[in-house]
Amino acid sequence: MRFDDSKYRKRFYPLSRLKGVEDLRVGIFTFGERLRKLFGETEFIFTPNFVPFEGLRENAPVILVDGKVVGFNPREVKGWEEAEEFARMGRALEIRGIFFENFWELPLKVEAVLENDLKMINLEGYYKIGEIYIHRTAKVSLKGEFGGWGLIDEGAVIKPFVVLEGGVYVGKGSLVKPFSYIVSSVIGPVCKVAGEISHTVFEGFSNKQHGGFVGHSYISSWVNIGAGTEVSNLKNTYGSVKVYSYEKEGLVDTGEIFLGMFAGDHVKIGINTTISTGTVLGIFANITAKDSPTEKFIPDFYWTGGGKMSLEKAIEMAMRVMGRRGVKPDEGYIDKIRESYG
C-alpha cells in the first residue's frame, strides 16, 4: 500500500506543510494509521484524506468513498485519471466512510470518526467508567464528571475535577489538568491540556496547559498555547466563516458557522492572545497579545508585531522543542523546513 496526497496536499496546508496528509489525526488514529490497519496487505495506491468505515468486501480495481475516487490497484489502473474513468464506467467499489475535502472539516467530524475507531481497538486491556474505556495503565481521578463516551489511552493522566462530554479521546501519555472541560475532542499523544476545549483535535506533542477556550479547531504538532488564550469559533453575526486557503491564495467561504483556529506545526501563542474566528496560522508562526485580535491569516514563520523569524532560529527552535520530548528531527524534516521557508 502506498499514499499519494499530491492532489489534495495543498488543500490541507498549513497542517500538511511539514508532513503528508496521511499523518494528520482525526479520531484515535491518523489517516495513515487507520488505512494501514484496514488495507495494509493490499497493493492499492490511496489518497489518504478519507476515513473508511469498512474494509474491502470484494476485489475491485478502484475504490470510492462518498462518490470520490480514493484508491486504485496499480496492477489494473495506470493512474488517477484512468481511475476516474473506471468509476464513470461503473467499475469501482463504493465503501462506507467519510471523505475530507478541506482542512477545516477535520474537527467537525470527530465524533463520527471516533465512534468508528472504537470498533477497531482491542479493548481487552481497558475497563469502563460509564461509557468511557480506560487503559489499565492510565491514571484517572474519580473526582470528575465522565458523562461522555470514548477512550483514555495507555499512560494518560486525568487529574481531579475534569468534565468529559460527548465523544472524547485522550491519547497515550497525555495529561488533562484539573478543572478542565473537554467536549467532543481528540487529544493526541504526549499532550498537556487544560481549560475549555470543544470540538477540537490536538494532533500530538502540543500543549495548552492553562485556562482559556479553544473550539472547532485543529492544533498540529509542537504547538504551545499560552495562558489565557481565547479562540473565537463563532461570528457575532452567526454568519458563515471564511478561512485562508493556501491552494486558492485567499479567503474562501466554508459555509460553516462554527470554526476556530487551524495552527500549523511549531506555532507558538503568547499569553492572553485573542484568536479571531477561522484564523489560519502558518508553520512556526509566533504571535502574542500585541497581535490581538489576530488577522484571518498569519503566514508561515511570522514573528509577533509583523516580522519574520529567521530560518536559523526556526530550525534551532524545532530541534530544541522536539528534543525535550526525545524526538530528533532527521535531515529530511529539516529540509522540509528549509523548503517551506522559501
PLM segments and residue spans:
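Surface-exposed loop/turn and secondary-structure junction residues enriched for glycine/proline
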Residues: 15-18, 27-29, 103, 109, ...
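Glycine-rich hexapeptide-repeat left-handed beta-helix
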Residues: 179, 193-342
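Short, functional N-terminal and low-complexity linear motifs
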Residues: 1-4, 80-85, 140, 158, ...
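Short, flexible segments with low predicted structural confidence
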Residues: 3-7, 82, 146, 163-164, ...
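Terminal amphipathic alpha-helical/low-complexity segments used for targeting or macromolecular assembly
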Residues: 1-131, 297-342
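Extended beta-solenoid/beta-helix repeat architectures
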Residues: 121-220, 235-236, 262, 280-281
